[in-house]
From Swiss-Prot:
Protein name: Conidiophore development regulator abaA
Biological process, per Gene Ontology: conidium formation; sporulation resulting in formation of a cellular spore
Record key words, sorted: Activator, Conidiation, Nucleus, Sporulation, Transcription, Transcription regulation
Organism: Penicillium digitatum (strain PHI26 / CECT 20796) (Green mold)
Biased composition (Low complexity): 235-247
Gene3D superfamilies tied to this protein: TEA/ATTS domain
PANTHER family: PROTEIN SCALLOPED, TRANSCRIPTIONAL ENHANCER FACTOR TEF RELATED
Feature: compositional bias, Basic residues: 84-95
Single GO MF descriptor: RNA polymerase II cis-regulatory region sequence-specific DNA binding
DNA-binding region: 128-202
Basic and acidic residues biased stretches: 115-132
């Protein structure tokens, strides 16, 4: 027995096949695949219809020598009957593409209209950055197909990975996918406007450029149509996307129909559409085997000395159903390369992702010397019925990149060029040299553990081997280049030369079988999460209508925060050098005297006394007058206030300017609800803080009261009632010649004011007062008025 594998006997996967298997038994089996016969057997036992389809395929392959099939069972039919049968077959083929394809083609009648043909005959003057006309015939055809594939969406957006796309952006992307030439959103919009000037009013054109009314669209379509170049349906519906035996759209395509000049090609030939992109990269056949052959034996799995694993189930149908990628436990850590592909927003996953779960049955001993390891990996992109519809056999520059990981850590990375295939089958390489060395090492470790004679060591070696295979994973990426990409790769600016297309991604998971089990491999398709969802644009945020604030809440919010008066700021207060600053006390808004402001009739009663006991205000620095809580024209001054004596025990209230009158001894205390001025308790007169009341006295544009000196305003009336005030509860001011211990305080500066001009002369005031009646009809100012003192007062 050999102690290792012979390196020169390792079978490489890229050996060329020089003949049949029987003549060259030393060749690798993967070059003489065992499923060649299975691909051709269906022609031998096919019925007449299948043979006719084969003839149609030959006619499509060689268009210069068309061959119309002759029915084998109806040789005596006349030519008219044959034409009728061909017409019926043509209709069936049209219906096999889709329910709306024929009607969609018929609705594009504006392409044959005189106006559109006139536009197409115009010379192309504009040249793009790629040096070609902005809308050449090729781009014009792609543009028309993009209009069909991306229906009008109005102001809605098509969202993908956090980015929104409008219809014009989708059309530009569609054109790029179809032709490889970039056209911007603005170019698409401008082209739509130009065509609209020619075709406006045409029903077919209006259908493509105008969104249907909400009533019609909701009743006919039910929901907004989705763009066809990238939709979430291709990821969420595994049966429609991957079902290899249910693809009715690929069976019996229109082989005998050719697109004619001036019209669009059939919709199902649009390689940029969602259906065709998915179909071009869909794998319809798969095979994987790994075996060892003894020396001098035919290098095929039928003559294998030992089979590590082989495919379970049919070559064309997976034994396991499709599964969402997110359901694979730890797929990001197991397949780092796949995670980077999925997260790449610039290169979305538009190909098949195949998961292969490989169970390996290891050898119990070393193979004979000069044994060969065979690995066969085949992927078939051809449909079993339609064959190579999309020209996969014409693609070249096939490459395969392989990444093998252990616990997510990269063990090996390789990039191989594959030979150009002449069929729809591709044979990727799978690192046979690395696998041969790995199998040799695993077998050697197992033999050493068994030779030790210690069962515990043998069990530990077996567990280590199982854990090693369980931690193994691999990712393979297949890419190829279509022939048209060579012509279009460098014809627009900004292209970096990577015109290859990702054709398939294979991800591998491994495990070791239990004793007595056979190594098998199963494959299934993985469905990545959808990366496009249709969302409407959010509506503009409208303003929130808040209820209006009441006057009480405005006064409270303006005067204080949480019941505390703020310390006067420097710009609000100019202190006198001889005055001392004291902190404002807490103000507790009372609730027991609010009702006293209203008389039984529901109106404000300015004559009703507030029964709240007042405190003494001792020589505080006066701030702006509270006569007008909203006024900003009251200039701050440093004015010492008089002392108003009252019962102690209640919190100290606001310091305010005293009202400088020409008669000493009239001290005023402030009612602390709604800013009322209240005289001493022996006088029952309230002065309400109201802009309307003050303006009725002095006018709206007069100088503030703070700036008036006590020697410039003479109150020359026994009792005064101002007409037009607040009604029956008129605003009164009573005067009593008595002193409270403190005379009026003089202001520091006495400047002339214009207050004298507001009042008539003293003689005229005497005459007016003398003529006034003391009756009760003077708006409550007579002797019977509430709160009025009948004592005689000398006029000033």
């Amino acid at each position: 027995m050999a102690t290792g594998w012979q390196p020169e006997c390792l079978v490489t996967q890229n050996q060329s096949s020089l003949g049949p298997v029987e003549a060259h038994s030393d060749r690798a089996l993967q070059n003489t695949t065992g499923n060649v016969q299975s691909y051709s057997d269906h022609l031998t036992h096919a019925d007449i219809a299948a043979r006719e389809d084969q003839l149609h395929q030959l006619g499509f392959k060689y268009p210069h020598a068309p061959h119309h099939p002759q029915p084998l069972s109806a040789s005596g039919l006349d030519q008219q009957h044959v034409a009728a049968r061909l017409h019926q077959r043509k209709l069936r083929r049209l219906h096999s593409v889709g329910p709306n394809s024929q009607s969609r083609r018929a609705r594009s009648s504006y392409l044959k209209s005189q106006k559109y043909l006139e536009y197409r005959r115009r010379p192309r003057r504009d040249t793009g950055k790629d040096g070609e006309p902005v809308w050449s015939d090729e781009l014009e055809d792609a543009f028309q197909q993009a209009l069909e594939a991306n229906p009008p969406m109005g102001r809605r957006k098509w969202s993908e990975r956090g980015k929104s796309y409008g219809r014009n952006e989708l059309i530009a992307e569609y054109i790029f996918k179809l032709t490889g030439k970039r056209r911007t959103r603005k170019q698409v919009s401008s082209h739509l406007q130009v065509l609209d000037s020619f075709l406006k009013g045409d029903p077919d054109w209006e259908r493509l450029v105008r969104e249907a009314s909400p009533e019609r669209s909701s009743s006919v379509h039910g929901s907004a149509p989705a763009p066809k170049w990238r939709t979430a349906v291709e990821h969420t519906s595994a049966s429609s996307h991957y079902g290899s035996h249910t693809h009715g759209s690929y069976h019996d395509h229109m082989r005998s129909m050719q697109p004619y000049a001036g019209d669009l090609p059939p919709p199902h030939y649009t390689l940029g559409s969602n259906m065709q992109e998915a179909a071009a990269s869909t794998i319809h056949g798969f095979n994987f085997d790994m075996w060892v052959t003894a020396p001098q034996q035919a290098n095929r799995i039928g003559k294998a000395l030992h089979t590590y694993t082989r495919l379970q189930g049919d070559l064309h149908h997976s034994a396991a159903s499709s599964m969402p990628l997110e359901h694979v436990n730890g797929w990001r850590s197991s397949f780092p390369q796949l995670a980077s592909m999925v997260d790449d927003i610039n290169n979305p996953m538009d190909c098949d992702i195949i998961l292969l779960e490989v169970n390996l049955e290891l050898m119990t001993d070393f193979p004979p010397a000069r044994s060969q390891l065979g690995i066969q990996l085949d992927l078939d992109f051809g449909h079993p019925s339609a064959g190579d519809v999309f020209g996969v056999s014409q693609m070249d520059n096939w490459t395969c990149s392989t990444h093998i990981y252990e616990d997510g850590q990269k063990l090996i990375e390789s990039h191989d060029d594959l030979p150009k295939t002449q069929s729809t089958k591709v044979k990727p390489l799978f690192e046979s040299s690395w696998w041969a060395k790995m199998f040799t090492k695993v077998t050697q470790d197992k033999r050493m553990a068994e030779d030790s004679g210690n069962p515990q060591v043998a069990r530990e070696a077996d567990d280590n081997t199982r854990n090693f295979f369980r931690s193994l994973s691999a990712v393979q990426e297949l890419r190829a280049t279509s022939p048209s990409s060579h012509r279009l790769s460098n014809q627009y600016q900004g292209h970096h030369g990577d015109e290859s297309k990702r054709m398939a991604v294979l991800v591998w998971k491994f495990r070791q079988t239990r004793p007595g089990q056979v190594g098998t491999t199963t494959w299934r398709r993985l469905i990545p999460a959808p990366d496009r969802t249709s969302n409407n644009s959010p509506l503009a945020v409208s303003g929130i209508d808040l209820p209006p604030l009441s006057l009480d809440s405005i006064l409270l919010n303006k005067a204080s925060h949480q019941g505390m008066y703020q310390t006067p700021q420097p710009h609000d207060l100019i202190p006198h050098p001889s005055q001392s600053h004291s902190q404002w006390s807490l103000y507790h808004p009372p609730h027991d005297n609010v009702a006293n402001l209203f008389n039984p009739s529901g109106h404000l009663d300015f004559l009703a006394s507030i029964s709240k006991a007042e405190d003494t205000i001792n020589d505080k620095i006066a701030v702006t007058s509270v006569l007008d809580s909203f006024s900003t024209s009251l200039a701050p001054e440093s004015i010492p206030s008089t002392s108003l004596h009252g019962p102690s025990g209640a919190p100290v209230m606001l310091n305010v300017h005293d009202l400088p009158l020409s008669h000493p001894g009239i001290g005023y205390a402030m009612g602390h609800e709604a800013s009322h001025y209240v005289p001493s308790h022996q006088h029952s007169v309230n002065m309400h803080d109201s802009n309307g009341v003050l303006h009725s006295f002095f006018g709206s544009n007069m100088q503030p009261l703070d700036d008036l000196s006590h020697s410039h305003a003479s109150w020359g009336a026994h009792s005064t009632s101002i007409p037009g005030d607040v009604g029956a509860g008129s605003y009164h001011l009573s005067y009593h010649p008595e002193h409270h211990g403190h005379g009026p305080v003089s202001r520091e500066s006495q400047q002339p004011h214009h207050f004298d001009s507001l009042l008539p002369s003293e003689d005229l005031m005497d005459k007016i007062v003398g003529r006034m009646s003391n009756g009760a009809s003077m708006h409550g100012a007579g002797p019977d008025a509430a709160g009025y003192d009948n004592s005689t007062v000398d006029s000033v």
